[in-house]
From Swiss-Prot:
Residues 22-137 form the Rhodanese domain. Residues 158-300 form the Tyrosine-protein phosphatase domain. The modification Phosphoserine is found at S446, S501. It is found in: Cytoplasm; Nucleus; Cytoplasmic vesicle. Its EC number is 3.1.3.16, 3.1.3.48. This is Dual specificity protein phosphatase 16. It comes from Homo sapiens.
Amino acid sequence: MAHEMIGTQIVTERLVALLESGTEKVLLIDSRPFVEYNTSHILEAININCSKLMKRRLQQDKVLITELIQHSAKHKVDIDCSQKVVVYDQSSQDVASLSSDCFLTVLLGKLEKSFNSVHLLAGGFAEFSRCFPGLCEGKSTLVPTCISQPCLPVANIGPTRILPNLYLGCQRDVLNKELMQQNGIGYVLNASNTCPKPDFIPESHFLRVPVNDSFCEKILPWLDKSVDFIEKAKASNGCVLVHCLAGISRSATIAIAYIMKRMDMSLDEAYRFVKEKRPTISPNFNFLGQLLDYEKKIKNQTGASGPKSKLKLLHLEKPNEPVPAVSEGGQKSETPLSPPCADSATSEAAGQRPVHPASVPSVPSVQPSLLEDSPLVQALSGLHLSADRLEDSNKLKRSFSLDIKSVSYSASMAASLHGFSSSEDALEYYKPSTTLDGTNKLCQFSPVQELSEQTPETSPDKEEASIPKKLQTARPSDSQSKRLHSVRTSSSGTAQRSLLSPLHRSGSVEDNYHTSFLFGLSTSQQHLTKSAGLGLKGWHSDILAPQTSTPSLTSSWYFATESSHFYSASAIYGGSASYSAYSCSQLPTCGDQVYSVRRRQKPSDRADSRRSWHEESPFEKQFKRRSCQMEFGESIMSENRSREELGKVGSQSSFSGSMEIIEVS
């Protein structure tokens, strides 16, 4: 507040501070005519009207000023010469502007003879009522004054509603029974020593905070008790009025403290909140400093549990936020939507660890549809991670005469695509899909070296699953058609493949030791082979996989520990030592008892392994019409190879391979 006193002149802010503090007795004298006084005046002001008769009697000393004060006061006033006296009229600014024969000049002269401190209110009642309408009372509800500050209300009629159960007002409001009943106020918190308790308020609904508006009062010890009293009124569905003399400093301090504690606001936020509701509030600096201490006290009480509850609330709001997975190396990594390809070591590690089918978790329902919809071309082009090798992948040439529409990834390839460091991590990620029928119709990983081709197109005869099941019980008796893989599943599953050898056949692929491209026969081909009674000759009859699959598994290659599962396409382009970008694990030797493969004896002369075109049967010609030529311009080495090594061995790694896929059109 701006405190200013010039001679016998006092400003309105200083007068309000004196009235709020209560430390000094202030005698207010209204020198206006009685009609104006009766209309509106400052609280507790005494009217000494400026009639000509009263002026003459004062000038002739026919009446004492003290007697005139007692006569004009509504109740007995203790006259003390040491108390301050403030006189005001309608709009006088200072004593110098007054004429010598006016009533106000005569009144001030007589008061100075009886009291030590006499002051004239600058601006008079007009200025005071404009700045502090809440401290004015009278019969009229509105004070006809000029408004120069739009931020302040014209008149504060009644208490101010801060919250639904909290009102802030002055002494005039609490003494107005009708106004209190209209607002439903049944509790009163009186923050003063002098303001009386209303008669219509019971003692149990009344609380007095005996503090004065001064710079030495302690209001902090009363704040918690005041907050509890307001909460008591709220619990009883009642409204409480917090008031002092003017509703500016003491009562505003208590209201701000309540907002701070119950609405979890800082001092600045609570002050602005109350200021917007009641612009006339102005706690003194002493109370503001104690509110700062109260803010620290609240933070100390709720500091331990506050941040925890907020973090917990934040976590409950985001339950679907992806949680980063921690790999074996201790680094955090999130599962991407388009998983990158891992190195060949991961594929080999996944290929050497057999897992029991019962221990394989289920595949997420989103993943099979994502994999089935992806074409083989995207699978081959997405084998590389680094952006600088994209131009190398563009050199990869492939041409298919068959319309291969989709490909199913194996668990080892999917594990490398998703960036899993081991096969255990991949098996925990992939779980059985609920969309497939049966327990043995899911994409699983197994070290069993049984390969089969699933034709991407539906069979011409539209065979059902019951036909291949008969093939498993009644197999062809012909010796050539019995050249099948005998699969033996080991329960321990820990045997390591010490020697790897390819399946030799005529052609340029035979000369390459590191990679073998193996394809079997589809279910329809096996059925036609049995019904025709023909034995396939040449390398086509090396592998006849006695497996079957439901139509839902058409156009996909699977593999598992049982004979009803297959290798996926990644087994063909997956993890050999030299061509890790394309090939997978090779066939084991016959010496390995765990992975035994029965195949025909390789002829000594490679030229005799294939006959001329006119010597072949029409059945074989029909199979050989459908061929797939795969030409690889340049093989891409594994990711851990440096570019220098790639330049050295680039000429040796390029090869041209032809492979034939047998299919019944």
